[in-house]
Amino acid sequence: MGLAVDTLELVDFRSIEDRRIAFSPATTVLVGPNAAGKTNTVEALQMLTAGFSFRRPTPAQLVREGARAARVSARLTGDGRVVDVRCDVFAGRRQFSRNGKKCHAPDIPGTLMSVLFTPDDLSLVKRGASGRRDELDGFGRQANAGYSRLLAAYARAVEH
């Protein structure tokens, strides 16, 4: 079965002041009116699984207006394991941790696999092979912690 999100907590993240969501072991559906924070919730989950936001914001844009810092954290459970992942945003930067130990964004993928599909992703079909390769590379980064280093080495080799 692997790990699954048990709970998600957002504090001063985007438009959300303080929210704790308990996820169902089967399926969780986010329902609400416009501007209720559904997309912000999906963005927070993606940050904790991929190590970055699909919106590509600056760290300051992640912090709720009027707040000094933001926190996104999740408890992942499954296979007899519990893993806590967290991202604190403050002073213009993001700090990730797993089970209370600081780590870097590239270390986050692989803890819990996720795939995000937005209406903008329809361009995968339209934009050609390079766009599809970029998307596959994103999946590779989540599946294997060393994949980012491998891609960087490949890019350097191709340049020379």
PLM feature spans:
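Weak global preference for isoleucine
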Residues: I16, I21, V82-V85, I108, ...
